């Protein structure tokens, strides 16, 4: 049975890695598939946090050279590097403030399958709306984002604290609304994910460190590696995809997933 739980952890790790950076809500997928395969981890919330950490580290690895260049440029006084670093900080700040104030409310009240399903469907409608508008894309390079655009993306990210919204979905759509091209919005979403998810993961790991035991470390480790590998496959593919296609296919997928979760919650006792 323990080996079977490891296989389940491997599967959910891949699910996390495949869905974290797509605008389709990794939370919704983990709730649904975790219920379907009846996965139980003594690590609970820590398992989810660590596999999310695996996904974000994949982005750090893929963009490592750009990150290194930005850091070097920042400390050497390069204006563009400093501008971009400040832009990420501006976008990151609203999530820090709202997250600290609302974390208990979000986890105790909003974290339910019904909320996730509704957020998936509403998010899909917003994607359809944004894609139907002809916004003037003033910025085609993520590193050229303005401070105003960064703030708008940061505020959009706060909406993603509602489970099922999708952090990547909110920030990509928010970026497009602010005047970024689809590709620039996607790449800025990746960079914003780094401090946001690393910060959230660190906070949750410290808060739940007592549940990390030798009994659940294998499941957590397997899930981490699976999420890392899956995210490596998705990130570059997503950038190539959004250069040529709209986000409408993800919107349709969100509606289907939202309806499935609603049905499962009402008739099959699906729980978060």
UniProtKB/Swiss-Prot annotation:
Protein name: Undecaprenyl-diphosphatase
HAMAP family: Undec_diphosphatase (MF_01006)
Organism superkingdom: Bacteria
A GO cellular-component term linked to this record: plasma membrane
Catalyses which reaction(s): di-trans,octa-cis-undecaprenyl diphosphate + H2O = di-trans,octa-cis-undecaprenyl phosphate + phosphate + H(+)
Miscellaneous remark of the record: Bacitracin is thought to be involved in the inhibition of peptidoglycan synthesis by sequestering undecaprenyl diphosphate, thereby reducing the pool of lipid carrier available.
InterPro entries named among the record's database cross-references: UppP (IPR003824)
Keyword field: Antibiotic resistance, Cell inner membrane, Cell membrane, Cell shape, Cell wall biogenesis/degradation, Hydrolase, Membrane, Peptidoglycan synthesis, Transmembrane, Transmembrane helix
GO molecular function: undecaprenyl-diphosphatase activity
EC code(s) of this entry: 3.6.1.27
Gene Ontology BP, a term: cell wall organization
Native source organism of the sequence: Acinetobacter baumannii (strain AYE)
Main subcellular localisation: membrane
